[in-house]
Curated annotation (Swiss-Prot):
Protein name: Transcription elongation factor GreA
UniProtKB keywords: Coiled coil, DNA-binding, Transcription, Transcription regulation
Domain of life of the source: Bacteria
Organism: Mesomycoplasma hyopneumoniae (strain 7448)
HAMAP family linked to this entry: GreA_GreB (MF_00105)
């Protein structure tokens, strides 16, 4: 499964809520502020050499572009629902695995590329490790190829 399926964008419920919150802030705070900045800059007179006006207009363009981007994401969002109660790894699964050679244990959640945040242990479904794990089950030993091949054992799959 990819992050975009039939023109839908796969997101966790949490990520969708974050995007909606950002959109609300952009519309209700940032957009209002930049409109005021433009009005203030216009009141200074000649716009041909008004740096504040140019900066405010550029900022407005960035804000409006981000608003359109977020609205598109929201309109195409499909919430990821892991296979509840299943031991099969899917997008949305939290997975604990052990490196067979080193014994090192890692735990992370497989999410869409939009949701991915390695600092929060959320990896993209496009990453090599996720690609190796998707469709596998708790207890399976899987070969992962990231620069070099190594084997991992799936210790636990949590689908909530």
């Amino acid at each position: 499964m990819k992050s975009i399926v039939n023109d839908k964008i796969l997101l966790t419920q949490q990520k969708l809520e974050e995007i909606e919150k950002e959109l609300e802030h952009l519309i209700n705070v940032e957009r209002v502020n930049v409109i005021q900045e433009i009005k203030d800059a216009r009141s200074q007179g000649d716009l041909s050499e008004n740096a504040e006006y140019d900066v405010a207009r550029e900022k407005q363009g960035i804000i409006e572009s981000r608003i359109r981007e977020l609205e598109t994401i929201i309109s195409k969002a499909k919430i990821i629902k892991a296979d509840l109660g299943s031991s099969r790894v899917s997008i949305g699964s939290k997975v604990s695995l052990e490196n067979v050679e080193s014994g090192e244990i890692q735990t992370f959640q497989i999410v869409s590329s939009i949701d991915a945040d390695p600092f929060k242990s959320k990896i993209s479904n496009f990453s090599p490790i996720a690609q190796a794990l998707l469709g596998q089950h708790q207890g399976d030993e899987v070969e992962v190829d990231v620069n070099e091949k190594y084997s991992v054992r799936i210790l636990e799959v949590i689908n909530e």
